[in-house]
Amino acid sequence: MPDTRDLFSEATERAELGRLDEALALFQALLKTDSNNATIWNNLGIILFRQGKYRDAVNAFGQATDTDPEFTNAWYNKSLALIHLGKETEALRALDKAIKLNPRDAEAQSQRALIVRKMAQVSDTGKTDSHSAQSQLRV
């Protein structure tokens, strides 16, 4: 049986090749032996997000932030998944955590401003675009 580092590398490689189902299975296998690893949870969330499974992605990013409350990228990624679920208020809370941890994060600041602007438009027009996340997920 390969060691954890080898399995992690294999999972990451499969994800980069777009073999998401294989990457997902490998990250899930890793969690069976190391369920308190925030990096694995974050990577699992990225795979789920890329598969369009936003609710599951939010849960995985939440596990990452529960395991490591200072994992800025997991907070940021969670916000993007929440946006896709139309949960802008929760997305703002996650972004605020990321920004508090890294106040110089221009991308998080920009994403926050975009959400606030979209929320203002919704209050003006009554319409929403739940797929407004313009940023890339972070490993």
Annotate each PLM feature.
Residues 3-5, 10, 16-29, 50-63, ...:
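Structural signature of tandem alpha-helical TPR/SEL1-like repeats
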Residues 29-47:
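Short, charge-rich amphipathic alpha-helical segments embedded
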